[in-house]
Amino acid sequence: MATRRILKELKELQRDPPVSCSAGPTGEDMFHWQATIMGPNESPYSGGVFLVNIHFPPDYPFKPPKVVFRTKVFHPNINSNGNICLDILKDQWSPALTISKVLLSICSLLTDPNPDDPLVPEIAHIYKTDKTKYEAMARSWTQKYALF
């Protein structure tokens, strides 16, 4: 079941890729993908290229994929290990969701962080109290870690 669904999503992604994202298997293993997310223009991540690993569980799509940033990013919902705090990757997951929708949700999270459900409280505090400083730090990290 999982392999068929993953192949279907891969074909859809190749036919109709989401804006500023791409994804596909890293090798022969269909359960391990790498994705590329371009930093959204209207965000401090603009110009950055962010690499993301995607690991599908054997019971996909009934369980969410594990999605982890490989590129360091200064963000209240993404920690230093690359883990992402995003509801659809946890309790709000639905088998109706696809990797394409997950990637678009991550792009949206880059544009609009959720400081009320942070993975990194210190960054959430900066975001809430000094947005200019937050944006400068996010831009700085993007230039340091996400430019190719």
From Swiss-Prot:
Hydrolase keyword on record: no
Enzyme class: transferase
Pathway membership, UniProt: Protein modification; protein ubiquitination
Keywords of the record: ATP-binding, Nucleotide-binding, Transferase, Ubl conjugation pathway
UniProt GO BP: protein ubiquitination; ubiquitin-dependent protein catabolic process
Chemical reaction(s) catalysed: S-ubiquitinyl-[E1 ubiquitin-activating enzyme]-L-cysteine + [E2 ubiquitin-conjugating enzyme]-L-cysteine = [E1 ubiquitin-activating enzyme]-L-cysteine + S-ubiquitinyl-[E2 ubiquitin-conjugating enzyme]-L-cysteine
EC number in record: 2.3.2.23
Residues of the UBC core domain: 1-147
GO molecular-function terms, A-Z: ATP binding; ubiquitin conjugating enzyme activity; ubiquitin-protein transferase activity
Pfam assignment, any one: UQ_con
Catalytic residues of the enzyme: C85 (glycyl thioester intermediate)
Similarity-based family: Belongs to the ubiquitin-conjugating enzyme family.
Alphabetized PANTHER family for the sequence: UBIQUITIN-CONJUGATING ENZYME E2
Reported function: Accepts the ubiquitin from the E1 complex and catalyzes its covalent attachment to other proteins.
Protein name: Ubiquitin-conjugating enzyme E2 29
Gene that specifies this protein: UBC29
